[in-house]
């Protein structure tokens, strides 16, 4: 019997990563309001709370039978969380701050089925090139970065801004495959069985 997997996300990047496998899944956007959760200084706990909140909102709104998969990614630099920018100007300021620096990306992945909840995390270090300020507005507009935490994308023009990535590149895109693989095993779903 095929597993019922529900991707609780509107992220095209997470959907694309999951489509690397033949595992059937449906998408439901969570109603959880991320900005309702205040950041209290622990980025790992914050990311986990958001991922779990998204999964619980899907249960509350839809009560599906399958395994719900949600994730939350945060960018951290010098103790500050960089969420999705709310404006072009905020995205540009984020890029200026991260220019030439190394920051952390934490993604929490939550799987929830009925009362069974499993959560995992991945942390990756990303170092930016020195960014020419006069082009940052163009970058934000060209790659529609307002829906991406930290105001940037590794897939679209990432080579212009990223010097190197230490750790899981899929984590930077919002869904670390290694973490997902281990969590799915707890629900008797093996990604090796779903290779394309």
From Swiss-Prot:
Record-level Gene Ontology MF annotations: dTTP diphosphatase activity; UTP diphosphatase activity
Assigned EC number: 3.6.1.9
Top-level taxonomic group: Bacteria
Site annotation Important for substrate specificity: residues: 13, 73, 155
Keywords (A to Z) from UniProt = Cytoplasm, Hydrolase, Nucleotide metabolism
Q: Reaction(s) catalyzed by this protein?
A: dTTP + H2O = dTMP + diphosphate + H(+); UTP + H2O = UMP + diphosphate + H(+)
BP terms from Gene Ontology: nucleotide metabolic process
Instruction: Specify the enzyme's EC class, one word.
Output: hydrolase
Q: Which Pfam family is one of those matched by this entry?
A: Maf
What stretch or stretches form a coiled coil here?
A: none
Q: Give the required cofactors.
A: a divalent metal cation
Q: Where is the active site?
A: 72
* Subcellular location(s) of the protein: Cytoplasm
What Gene Ontology cellular-component terms does the record carry?
cytoplasm
InterPro entries, sorted: ITPase-like_fam, Maf-like
Task: Outline what the protein does.
Answer: Nucleoside triphosphate pyrophosphatase that hydrolyzes dTTP and UTP. May have a dual role in cell division arrest and in preventing the incorporation of modified nucleotides into cellular nucleic acids.
The Swiss-Prot or TrEMBL record describes its family as follows: Belongs to the Maf family. YhdE subfamily.
Q: What is this protein called?
A: dTTP/UTP pyrophosphatase
Source species taxonomy:
Bacteria, Pseudomonadati, Chlamydiota, Chlamydiia, Chlamydiales
């Amino acid at each position: 019997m095929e597993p019922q997997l529900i991707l609780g996300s509107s992220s095209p990047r997470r959907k694309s990563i999951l489509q690397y496998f033949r595992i059937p899944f449906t998408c439901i956007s969570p109603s959880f309001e991320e900005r309702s959760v205040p950041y209290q200084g622990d980025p790992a706990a914050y990311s986990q709370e958001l991922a779990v909140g998204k999964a619980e909102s899907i249960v509350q709104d839809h009560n599906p039978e399958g395994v719900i998969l949600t994730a939350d990614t945060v960018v951290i630099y010098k103790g500050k969380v960089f969420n999705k920018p709310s404006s072009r100007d905020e995205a540009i300021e984020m890029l200026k701050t991260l220019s030439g620096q190394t920051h952390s990306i934490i993604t929490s992945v939550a799987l929830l089925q009925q009362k069974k909840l499993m959560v995992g995390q991945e942390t990756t270090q990303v170092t930016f090139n020195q960014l020419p300020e006069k082009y940052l507005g163009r970058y934000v507009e060209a790659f529609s970065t307002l829906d991406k935490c930290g105001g940037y994308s590794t897939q679209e023009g990432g080579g212009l801004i990223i010097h190197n990535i230490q750790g899981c590149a899929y984590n930077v895109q919002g869904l670390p495959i290694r973490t997902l693989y281990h969590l799915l095993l707890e629900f008797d779903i093996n990604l090796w069985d779903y290779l394309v």
